[in-house]
Amino acid sequence: MAAIVYHAPFPLDREASSASGIRPVRMLDAFRELGYTVLDVTGSARERSRRLRALRDRLQGGERIEFLYSECATIPTMLTEPRHLPPHPFVDPALMRLMHRYGVPTSLFYRDIYWAFPDYRERVGAAMAAAMGCVYRYDLA
């Protein structure tokens, strides 16, 4: 069966109780149930970096990927580490560039775009909203 890349900038939690944790696991399971070989690029930034290198090797070796499916976190991708510091801030954009370079179609489930609305600025203040807006937009670039 065809191979796909499944990406999430966080570790998956099969015991999650909220939709933002349940959905990624169910989507991963659904792709497997459909018969896809799933190349998993999830976990910590270090894990994703290692998995990205392995994926690059597979592509350079001629493996064909049908598509990439990505789940966003509820916070900016580069801030998903436990301390919210980006030890590998370019690993996820590098994955997207790699997919583009090899002509792999990509799909992104983007949740919680509350930061784009005026009430976010009112809740967190103008400076924080401006800074976070830049980081969120970087995710979408």
For each of these PLM feature ranges, what is it?
Residues 10-12, 45-46, 73-76, 112-116:
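Short, solvent-exposed loop/turn segments at secondary-structure junctions
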Residues 108-109, 114-123:
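Glycine-rich, charge-decorated loop segments at or immediately adjacent to ligand/cofactor-binding or catalytic sites
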Residues 45-52, 83-95:
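Glycine-rich anion/phosphate-binding loops
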Residues 49-61, 123-126, 130:
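Charged, often glycine-rich, active-site loop that binds/positions anionic groups
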Residues 59-91, 103-109:
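Short N-terminal targeting/anchoring amphipathic segment
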Residues 90-101, 125-141:
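Membrane-proximal helix-turn-helix segments that form the acceptor-binding/catalytic region
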Residues 11-20, 75-90, 119-127:
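Short, flexible/disordered intra-domain loops and linkers
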Residues 1-46, 53, 63, 102-103:
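N-terminal subdomain of nucleotide-sugar transferases
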